[in-house]
Amino acid sequence: FLPMIAKLLGGLL
């Protein structure tokens, strides 16, 4: 995943 996507997923988790 892209850094931005990973950041969004990290926020959800």
From Swiss-Prot:
SS bond list: none
GO BP term, example: chemotaxis
PTM annotation (Leucine amide): residues: L13
Free-text tissue specificity from the UniProt record: Expressed by the venom gland.
GO MF term list: toxin activity
Entry's localization field: Secreted
Cellular component, GO annotation: extracellular region
UniProt keyword list: Amidation, Chemotaxis, G-protein coupled receptor impairing toxin, Mast cell degranulation, Secreted, Toxin
Membrane spanning stretches: none
Family: Belongs to the MCD family. Crabrolin subfamily.
Free-text function comment from the UniProt entry: Mast cell degranulating peptide. Induces the chemotaxis of neutrophils. Its mast cell degranulation activity may be related to the activation of G-protein coupled receptors in mast cells as well as interaction with other proteins located in cell endosomal membranes in the mast cells.
Protein name: Vespid chemotactic peptide A
Protein source organism: Vespa analis
Lineage of the organism: Eukaryota, Metazoa, Ecdysozoa, Arthropoda, Hexapoda
